[in-house]
């Protein structure tokens, strides 16, 4: 946005005031376009280093790869504007590489962890007593249906909480979701999701919803449509009992589904379609490591000589 862009450029001039001896006695409103011609590629490299950790008033600001890339890209656009209009004679930003963003490996649950997670939601409260037991039993079927649906379809958490009861079609075992951009799509589910949903719907019949929330598929404990944050919290709560080394969120359950589907089918276009990615390159980028694994398998799949 324009505000973010202006903020990024202001940080650059703040850096010049604080770190560059040539501008130490200046004020920020003293800068004119000609100053840009005095800046060198070395200055910009120092600015990039500065951005990693710097003081902004009483706060310490930090930038990771994405933050660095955005701020350096903003500066490059700023210079390009004046250079193209011949208001400056040099453009040192083209001599400095824009920071690369390294893809993080996909965090997902392994097959045994998926089974443990669902088992824990289903039976984790068996040893509880008192009020904790009551609370667990009250939400168990809903939570199991929610997590099973996320794991079994790969829908986004926003799509999940937006579901109405009318969106569920047991005749064809599909749910109608509204994707990013407002497009509607039917996502199909298997027997495990069907069973979990039907069990929850039996419990749901006994809930009297708050007015205006009658159509919501999943209710909160306040008898309203459950929110994204509530689902985030319950997924994290259960996942902590299964793994302490992975930070599992609803989005990681989506990654778990996408990974399982790709490993099962090897069809990146199918995965992209089911996950609702408009651009298959988005899917390829996320599952590149899995592609590498398949390519390694291909290396030994063809024998040149029989043993």
Residue ranges and their predicted role:
Residues 1-307:
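Conserved catalytic core of the tyrosine transesterase superfamily
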């Amino acid at each position: 946005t324009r505000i973010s862009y202006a903020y990024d450029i202001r940080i650059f001039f703040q850096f010049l005031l604080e770190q560059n001896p040539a501008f130490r006695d200046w004020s920020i409103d003293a800068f004119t376009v000609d100053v840009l011609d005095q800046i060198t590629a070395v200055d910009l490299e120092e600015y990039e280093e500065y951005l990693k950790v710097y003081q902004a008033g009483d706060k310490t600001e930090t930038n990771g790869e994405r933050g660095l890339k955005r701020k350096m890209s903003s500066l490059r656009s700023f210079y390009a504007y004046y250079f193209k209009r011949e208001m400056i004679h040099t453009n040192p930003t083209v001599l400095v590489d824009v920071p690369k963003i390294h893809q993080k490996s996909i965090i997902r649950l392994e097959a045994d962890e998926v089974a443990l997670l669902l088992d824990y939601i289903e039976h984790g409260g068996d040893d509880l007593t008192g009020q904790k037991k009551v609370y667990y039993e009250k939400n168990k079927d809903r939570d199991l249906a929610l997590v099973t649906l996320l794991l079994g379809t790969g829908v986004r958490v926003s799509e999940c909480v937006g579901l109405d009861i009318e969106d569920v079609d047991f005749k064809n075992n599909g749910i109608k979701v509204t994707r990013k951009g407002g497009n509607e799509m039917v996502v199909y589910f298997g027997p495990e999701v069907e069973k979990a949903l039907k069990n929850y719907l039996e419990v749901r019949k006994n809930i009297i919803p708050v007015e205006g929330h009658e159509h919501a598929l999943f209710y909160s404990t306040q008898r309203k449509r459950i929110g994204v944050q509530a689902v985030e919290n319950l997924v994290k709560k259960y996942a902590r009992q299964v793994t302490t080394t992975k930070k599992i969120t609803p989005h990681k359950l989506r990654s778990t589904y996408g990974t399982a589907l790709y490993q099962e089918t090897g069809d990146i276009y199918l995965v992209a379609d089911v996950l609702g990615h408009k651009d298959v390159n988005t899917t390829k980028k996320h599952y590149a490591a899995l592609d590498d694994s398949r390519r390694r398998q291909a290396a030994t799949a063809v024998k040149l000589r029989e043993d």
